[in-house]
Amino acid sequence: MKMDVIAREQIIYGSLQGSNKNKDWTSRLPPPSAYTLDLMSKKAKTTTGGSSNGSNATATSTTTSTSSSIKHKQPAGSSNNNVGQSQSKKTKPSGSYNSNSNYYYYAADEEEGGSADYALSNYDKKAVEELSLRLLDELRAAKSRHLTCTEVSLPCDLTPSVAREIIRVSEKEPRGIRGCTIYIEFEDEPKNSRRIASIKVDSDTVSTFEVYLTLRQDHRGWTSLLPQFMKSLARTITISPEYTITKNKLYSADGLGARRSYSFGSHAHRPSAAIATPTN
């Protein structure tokens, strides 16, 4: 019995029915059908759209997080680029910058202006404090040298108030407070005053004006109730909160000094507001 094996070979290799030739697998494959192409294009669009949406969402979230982090970091001055640009802004105010940078530059300029005002205010406070301490030192030195007493009591805000007024009257002077010479006079009785100290604020600066500070003795304290012989034993002088500042310019257009008198101090009695200078 003879068996036909050609049909089996045709089934295995996919040859055409009724042909004894096998399919040539080295030949080029036929193009896919239009239906297959349509399905593949739709699938590709769906996949690409989903991936692009995901990437856009990722990029958007990344951009949002990045921009939000920049907004939080830039005002604090933690960005290296902004630090360098703000420094160049200080040296080159006329430079051109983008809108986002301008926001921070203007904020920095406002802060600098605020900090400048704040620094000036601190300078005034420091000058007042230094001059107030110098006045206290001169009063301590004059206590035993000119006042012949063991204790000098004065209102707690007297020397800061005097220092503020002296600095205020020196604002329009060509050399400011550095060109001031202060003469301190003490008046124990009406129209009976004597000079007890003098201060040249800056010894290296030529004086352009003088300030005469007149302090008065307060006779309303507890020592006024003592008998005369007890007053000499107490040897305590109480300074009144009232004082007089007289400003004398050492220059003018016509060659004569312009003498101006200013009276400062509270006329109200300030009870128990006193500082006792200890005995050296």
Curated annotation (Swiss-Prot):
Disulfide bonds: none annotated. Pfam families: RTP801_C (PF07809). The keyword Hydrolase does not apply. Residues 39-96 are annotated as: Disordered. Transmembrane segments: none annotated. InterPro entries: RTP801-like, RTP801-like_C_sf. One of its GO terms (biological process) is negative regulation of growth. Keywords: Apoptosis, Cytoplasm, Developmental protein. It is found in: Cytoplasm. Residues 46-69, 77-96 have a biased composition (Low complexity). Inhibits cell growth by regulating the Tor pathway upstream of the Tsc1-Tsc2 complex and downstream of Akt1. Acts as a cell death activator during head development. This is Protein scylla. It comes from Drosophila melanogaster.
